[in-house]
């Protein structure tokens, strides 16, 4: 957040005074990082990361034959709700959400704050019209997409597999790196990375199931492209803006 967008300068001043000398230095460095990232970003297409699946890498997918009936029933129930446009957040709040959501919308308050403005210029702590960024972040953690991918793998559901992949593509198209409210928290970016690992592994394992026909090449190519869109930008962001010092995270 740049100085012009600070909601209460006195709060930041008092917090700055309570920081250690080393944390103050790092906060200043982070401030200038934000200025730099406002002007220019790396070309994430020029990454040097190895992104193809490796044997023994995280996550390790258990055998679908070992899944208990209780899990199958729960996955079927959750998948049906998600496909019908109902998503549960914070374990108890049910939201009606489009199949391809507005990723910067608080669906509980009905407030859409979609923007392509640089995240360095956004104050996520104070949204207009009673909106809460936590409702935006929760949907963009992709937890419901992990659930779809789990159901696809355990119950051999081709449609859930494809929808999970399509929704990640949709998120990427509407949340370009360092633009909008979903790029204001490195912690949220880290949670997305973890969930993406599961989505990738589960959908790839689903495609390899002979009962669905040979879809390994088609899905493998789609995921290969998706990794290039998701991983470099998120890894860079999470590391560059990692929590330190007195941060609650």
What residues fall within each predicted segment?
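Preference for short coil/turn "hinge" residues that link or interrupt alpha-helices
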Residues: 2, 9-12, 75, 96, ...
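Membrane-proximal basic amphipathic "stem/tether" segments
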Residues: 1-56
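Generic detection of long, well-ordered alpha-helical segments
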Residues: 6, 18, 22-25, 61, ...
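Intrinsic-disorder/low-complexity regions
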Residues: 4, 77-79, 248
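Short secondary-structure junctions and interdomain/linker hinges
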Residues: 19, 23, 35, 39-42, ...
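Extended, charge-enriched "interface" segments that sit outside catalytic cores
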Residues: 33-127, 134-138
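Hydrophobic, aliphatic-enriched repeat segments that assemble into extended interaction scaffolds
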Residues: 2, 65, 69-72, 190-197
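Aromatic-lined, polymer-binding surfaces characteristic
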Residues: 113-117, 126, 132-249
């Amino acid at each position: 957040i740049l100085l012009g967008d600070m909601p209460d300068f006195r709060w930041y001043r008092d917090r700055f005074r309570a920081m250690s000398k080393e944390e103050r230095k790092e906060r200043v460095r982070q401030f200038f990082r934000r200025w730099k990232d406002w002007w220019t970003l790396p070309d994430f297409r020029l990454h040097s990361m190895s992104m193809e699946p490796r044997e023994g890498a995280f996550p390790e997918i258990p055998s679908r034959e070992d899944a208990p009936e209780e899990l199958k029933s729960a996955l079927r129930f959750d998948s049906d709700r998600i496909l019908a446009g109902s998503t549960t957040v914070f374990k108890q709040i049910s939201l009606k959400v489009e199949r391809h959501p507005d990723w910067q919308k608080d669906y509980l308050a009905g407030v859409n704050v979609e923007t392509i403005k640089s995240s360095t210029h956004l104050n996520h702590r104070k949204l207009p019209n009673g909106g809460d960024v936590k409702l935006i972040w929760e949907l963009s953690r992709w937890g419901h997409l992990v659930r779809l991918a789990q159901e696809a793998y355990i119950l051999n559901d081709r449609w859930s597999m494809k929808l999970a992949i399509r929704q990640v593509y949709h998120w990427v198209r509407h949340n370009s790196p360092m633009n909008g409210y979903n790029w204001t928290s490195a912690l949220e970016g880290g949670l997305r990375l973890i969930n993406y690992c599961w989505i990738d592994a589960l959908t790839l394992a689903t495609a390899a199931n002979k009962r669905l026909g040979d879809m390994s090449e088609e899905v493998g190519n789609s995921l290969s492209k998706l990794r290039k869109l998701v991983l470099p930008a998120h890894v860079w962001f999470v590391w560059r803006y990692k929590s330190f010092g007195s941060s609650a995270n």
